[in-house]
């Protein structure tokens, strides 16, 4: 059947905007190279015209320079036209990319909208309000429990301002009595070491010689006690 009717030709895909823009830019660059080459020739002719004396030779150089200038103008026109086409293609490409971005944005928004609707079905405002109310009740109960546990025992609640002022005056008087001696409260004064003699209730040692009766001198030993006569020790 293919031999009779022929095979169907596969159509090539149309060129994209980027392909067309690249091809036109390539042509524009080629034309730009030609313009630069003609500029170099014109510079040579300019130098020749300066060095050549008036006459047929000068006219011939001017004619060639005029022909090169016409070619340059033609190539410049083609170059500008190609660059304008490239600019138009760039604008179209920018618009197409913007539409693609808009399509992707719309697709993402639709997907997000669908997902949010599914999530909102499981989350209700009334449930959130009820949960908040329950949390507030629990916090109030917790505060009451803490206050109950922190309540003091055997503390009178009927203390008024007069009682407070009387207590402060009594404290001030006590502190004044403690600081009268050395200007230091008793709780800041150093502790005194107890006297051993006071604790044992022993009599104090004699500080001097006891006076003997008149007319009789009594001998004493080295500790201040009456000396024992030696005769009594022998007997």
From Swiss-Prot:
One of its GO terms (cellular component) is multivesicular body membrane. Residues 20-30 have a biased composition (Basic and acidic residues). Keywords: Coiled coil, Endosome, Membrane, Protein transport, Transport. InterPro entries: Snf7_fam. The keyword Membrane applies. It is found in: Endosome, Multivesicular body membrane. One of its GO terms (biological process) is protein transport. It is a peripheral membrane protein. It comes from the Eukaryota. Residues 99-148 form a coiled coil. Its main location: membrane. The keyword Cell membrane does not apply. Residues 1-30, 174-235 are annotated as: Disordered. Belongs to the SNF7 family. PANTHER family: CHARGED MULTIVESICULAR BODY PROTEIN, VACUOLAR PROTEIN SORTING-ASSOCIATED PROTEIN 60.2. Probable peripherally associated component of the endosomal sorting required for transport complex III (ESCRT-III) which is involved in multivesicular bodies (MVBs) formation and sorting of endosomal cargo proteins into MVBs. This is Vacuolar protein sorting-associated protein 60.2. It comes from Arabidopsis thaliana (Mouse-ear cress). The lineage of its organism: Eukaryota, Viridiplantae, Streptophyta, Embryophyta, Tracheophyta.
